[in-house]
């Protein structure tokens, strides 16, 4: 499983669900999520899922246990720490070289935004240093022992997270398409996870991706394409064809945990009823409060849902008083997703800590 969370904190959850590490409960394993927007994964509902997954996993042989990995880009400094800790155990000389490379980030006090702003003002960045550490880790052969192979994989993806985070924050402050950088990083993580899982099990790897519709749908069927944006769902379809199955989630009304702006405290909002004529409104008009639709291969559904309609997207920020402008855009759901899940009324998650 790949979730829209950072690599390092999610890897702690992965160790817990696999019966590894020192955490004694799912809530403790989730306690690493301290930064905004921590409630997205540090909540009671995800905690309960993690506990159930651990119980299931412990009844399986190690190679069949389901992992939970982070695919997002907001992880430079914790990921660098993980790389250095791994190299120190397996190759102290490589660890020393990597530490020298990562000193490039040391003046920014573990604040990625400060690095991005500084890189914008200078012709110098830490791009080459981050790439050099990726090469250091890549030189270490992948162990045959499943547990050691898992640790090696974690180091590989941690090094990639440093490089991905460096590129993302440098791009954000340069005014370029940072969205594309982020979703391309997600795609590399998902493909890396699939390859790793396949190597462990001896079968083609399967990854369930858990993220917002804006990442998991196909951007070519949305207004985002007009802005030159791509996304994870699009990349998976382009690279893997029908092996990628994209599922969207829709709700008409309910409550949601969000913040009024990035970095501010979260609160529970009443989610406004969906706008007339939007996809969620059309789904509600069926009179069925919860259902799923398989769009792929269903020509009648594709015909009925093929015209562009408004589609709502609520992420970690919610602005109900300017909802039409900030949370709706045109989309063609029949091209965006292979399936859609609709629940008329949804409830907010329960934040922990």
For each feature predicted by the language model, list its residue ranges.
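Structured catalytic-domain cores with a bias toward divalent-metal coordination
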Residues: 1-353
């Amino acid at each position: 499983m790949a979730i829209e969370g950072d690599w390092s904190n999610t890897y702690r959850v992965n160790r817990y669900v696999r019966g590894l590490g020192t955490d004694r409960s799912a809530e403790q394993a989730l306690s690493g999520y301290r930064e905004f927007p921590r409630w997205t994964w540090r909540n009671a509902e995800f905690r309960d899922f993690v506990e159930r997954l651990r119980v299931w996993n412990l009844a399986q042989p190690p190679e069949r246990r389901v992992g939970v990995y982070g695919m997002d880009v907001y992880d430079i400094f914790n990921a660098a720490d993980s790389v250095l800790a791994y190299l120190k155990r397996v190759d102290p000389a490589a660890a020393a070289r990597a530490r020298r490379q990562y000193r490039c980030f040391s003046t920014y006090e573990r604040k990625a935004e400060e690095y991005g702003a500084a890189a914008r003002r200078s012709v110098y960045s830490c791009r080459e240093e981050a790439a050099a550490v990726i090469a250091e880790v890549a030189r270490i052969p992948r162990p045959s022992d499943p547990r050691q192979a898992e640790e090696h994989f974690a180091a590989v993806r941690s090094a990639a997270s440093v490089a991905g985070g460096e590129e993302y924050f440098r791009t954000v402050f340069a005014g370029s398409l940072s969205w594309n950088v982020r979703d391309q990083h997600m795609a590399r993580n998902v493909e890396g996870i699939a390859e790793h899982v396949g190597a462990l099990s001896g079968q083609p790897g399967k990854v369930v991706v858990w993220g917002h519709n804006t990442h998991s749908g196909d951007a070519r069927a949305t207004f985002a394409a007009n802005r030159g944006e791509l996304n994870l769902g699009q990349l998976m379809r382009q690279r893997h064809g029908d092996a990628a199955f994209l599922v969207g989630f829709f709700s008409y009304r309910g409550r949601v945990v969000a913040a009024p702006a990035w970095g501010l405290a979260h609160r529970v909002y009443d989610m406004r009823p969906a706008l007339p004529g939007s996809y969620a409104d059309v789904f509600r008009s069926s009179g069925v409060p919860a259902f799923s639709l398989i769009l792929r291969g269903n020509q009648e559904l594709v015909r009925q849902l093929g015209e562009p309609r408004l589609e709502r997207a609520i992420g970690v920020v919610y602005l109900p008083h300017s909802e039409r402008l900030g949370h709706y855009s045109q989309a063609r759901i029949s091209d965006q997703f292979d399936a859609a899940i609709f629940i008329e009324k949804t409830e907010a998650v329960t934040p922990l800590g």
